Design a protein with these regions (language model features):
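Glycine-rich phosphate-binding loops of nucleotide-dependent enzymes
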Residues: 1-168
Length: 168
C-alpha cells in the first residue's frame, strides 16, 4: 500500500540506507551498510522474489557468497543444511537442483539460507503471496518452531488474518 514497510525492512537488511534516524539492535545503535553488516547483527531477510540460481543445488545456493576460505566442502554444507532442515521441520533435499523445486521449496531454501548465516531476526516479505493454503499452514508451523527456538520473526503482509495467526 506504499506505506514503506518493505523499504524499512530493506534498511534493516542493508539493501537501502536511511537518510536520517538510527537503527538499534538490542538497544545499541548500529550502522548497516550492506547485507553482510545485517548478518553480523543477526538479521536476515527473505525477499518476496527469490534470489536463487536455478542450475545450482539447494546447498550450493545457500552457501553462495559465503567466504569460508578455500574450497567449498559440499558434503559439510549438505550436512549443515540437513541439520537446519531437521531442526525446524523443513522438507528439502540439499542436493536437489532449484529448477526441480516447487515455489514453496524455493522459499524454504531462502529461509534456510539466512538461518545458515546465523540470523536470529528473520524478516519475511509477503511470504504467503504465492503459497497454497496448505503450504501457508506448513510455513506457519515452521515459523512457530523458529519462534519457540528464540528467533524473532517479522512478517510484511497485507493479510490481517495471518498477522493474527502468528503474532504474540
Amino acid at each position: 500500500n506504499g506505506s514503506g514497510k518493505t523499504t524499512l525492512m530493506n534498511m534493516l537488511a542493508g539493501i537501502y540506507f536511511p537518510d536520517e534516524g538510527e537503527i538499534l539492535v538490542e538497544g545499541k545503535p548500529v550502522s548497516i551498510r550492506s547485507p553482510k553488516d545485517s548478518f553480523q547483527y543477526g538479521i536476515g531477510m527473505i525477499h518476496q522474489h527469490y534470489k536463487l540460481v536455478d542450475v545450482f543445488t539447494a546447498a550450493e545456493n545457500i552457501v553462495l557468497g559465503l567466504d569460508e576460505g578455500g574450497r567449498l566442502d559440499i558434503k559439510a554444507a549438505n550436512a549443515k543444511v540437513k541439520e537446519i532442515c531437521d531442526r525446524y521441520g523443513f522438507d528439502i533435499d540439499p542436493t536437489q537442483k532449484i529448477y526441480d523445486m516447487s515455489v514453496s521449496q524455493k522459499q524454504t531454501v531462502e529461509i534456510v539460507k539466512v538461518l545458515y548465516r546465523g540470523a536470529d531476526i528473520l524478516i519475511l516479505d509477503e511470504p504467503t503471496a504465492v503459497l497454497t493454503p496448505q503450504e501457508t499452514e506448513k510455513l506457519f508451523t515452521v515459523l512457530r518452531n523458529m519462534k519457540a527456538d528464540g528467533k524473532a520473526i517479522v512478517i510484511i503482509t497485507h493479510k490481517l488474518h495471518e498477522v493474527m495467526a502468528l503474532s504474540d
